Amino acid sequence: RGGAGPGAGSAEARSGVTSGASSLSVLGRVRAMAGPRRGRLALALLLGSLALGSAVGLMATSGWLISRASQQPPVLYLMVAVTATRAFGIGRAVFRYAERLVSHDTVLRMLADTRVAVYRRLERLAPAGLRTTRRGDLLSRLVADVDALQDYWVRWLLPAGAAAVVSAASVGFTAWLLPEAGAALAVGLLAAGAGVPLVTGAVARRAEHRLAPSRGVLATRVADLLTGTAELTVAGALPARTAAARKADQVLTRIASRAATATALGDGLTALVSGLTVAVTAFFGAQAVAAGRLSGVAMAVVVLTPLASFEAVLGMPLAVQFRQRVRRSAERVYEVLDAPEPVREPVEPAGAPVSPFPLRLAGLGARYAGQDRDALADLDLTLEQGRRVAVVGVSGAGKTTLAQVLLRFLDARAGTYTLGGVDAHTLEGDVVRRFVGLCAQDAHLFDSSVRENLLLARKGASEAELRDALARARLLDWVDGLPDGLDTLTGEHGARLSGGQRQRLALARALLADFPVLVLDEPAEHLDLPTADALTADLLAATEGRTTVLITHRLAGLDAVDEVVVLAEGRVVQRGSYAELVVVEGPLRAMAEREAAGELLARA
């Protein structure tokens, strides 16, 4: 979990990315990302202006040189222009290369800090804060939307700034040669650099606003398709899901096509304005030459300078589209950064207790963000060292919410939660999770070896310790029978293992971590009844003497625990030993009767 430790906020500090409400606009917050790197961006702007200025200077000087050379003056008279032409030609390439190097290096460093900030925010939000978020959409925000932020700098702000500088210089130089030509160039550059982008921006606005969300939808469809191919095939739903992915792709293609139409419109209008401006300046130049106010050599400069000047504004229509695109991507990124945290880390954490015992919940209530009803209410629970408690109830009773509160994945909104007499909310989340561990029903197995999956729990564990954990999880005989033993690959999400083997490997990992308190959240879920009951019995045997909270909706094996707590709609409706509760009228007995009837039906 991110956010713990003194360096947790360093990426946010470097990038200027902060969570929470902000008085800045979305694009204002993107600009704030520059932070201490504004000097390097100013250097990139200067280099970009010099590159464009060199292009204009090259065209103007070349025009003057060719026109003057046609008069066959002494060669030495042309040497300054020849040298300037060479300097502008070399400078154009050198300044452009330097501008790209400085701007991209600076912007990519900002993106790296931003991506780290987003990832750390996701760590703080997970798992309770991401309950309604799709994985594909999260991936799109973390990768594509963060990447899109670079376009604000390298395809909008820096090009627009360089275009403004070079346009002003070109207009000033042309007006110095011929005022009316300078005025015509000013009108043309204003039309191409501001008017055309406004038109194309209006045309593309709706498409650009929909582009990032549509990209997220496609990513979600593809992620679901790739991760659930086997299940979709078995259920016969693969064609429908494939069609949904194709439809999302077609929608994204149509949106991109509309944006491309606006780009083409902008290119065409810019070329038209450029041609008209050059024609007008040529007309004014011809009149000035006829009137004797302008030399024929200067006439070439008056005509060619506007032609080169339009290179500065040629990309402005596309730049405006990128600005619109960045705005929507930035909104999606800041939706993550501004999302309320389900857990608040203490500003000044308390010292960790020597022992977490007794672990005590008193009058505890918890609610997920956006819900109007408590998922847990008025819950009391005390765990002494070695005590084992089973929490049972139907789906939605609040069992998993209890697990999340115990691990501080979700903070209680009422009541108290203490570890060894210390308020858990005054401890860092990582400290709580060193005392309380989880073996979840959907524990993730990485696409690596059995050994590497176990070493996640304790990096320096010896071979003997790994084998001991596997033995306690009743998995050692299976591992010893594998050709590669501990180095056997498990496959993605443990695909090469059976359901029971995956759960046992997850249990072995939790046992290896040696948590003082171990929470087993529906460890036998998704298994057939005989396998589930056998696994539950083995889990209880493996945790003998360890403080354990077993969360389950199955009752098999619960006579081995010290207390059974029955939840319904987030409240405790019955508690006591299994032997006491199963013989009296109440929710547990009703559950036992339904379970027995289900087993009889299954055998039949």
Go through each PLM region and give its residues.
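An intracellular "coupling" helix at the cytosolic face of ABC transporter transmembrane type-1 domains
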Residues: 30-39, 127, 131, 144-153, ...
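Short cytosolic helices in intracellular loops of multi-pass membrane proteins
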Residues: 108-128, 135-139, 143, 209-251, ...
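ABC ATPase nucleotide-binding domain helical subdomain, centered on the C-loop/LSGGQ "ABC signature"
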Residues: 416, 451-491, 537, 545, ...
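Transmembrane helices of ABC transporter permease
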Residues: 44-50, 158-210, 283-294, 311
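C-terminal portion of ABC ATPase nucleotide-binding domains
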Residues: 1-20, 24-28, 537, 545, ...
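ABC transporter TMD-NBD coupling linker
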Residues: 306-370, 411-414, 418, 461-469, ...
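Helix-to-loop junction immediately C-terminal to a conserved catalytic motif
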Residues: 407
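Helix-loop-helix
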Residues: 63-84, 173-187, 262-331
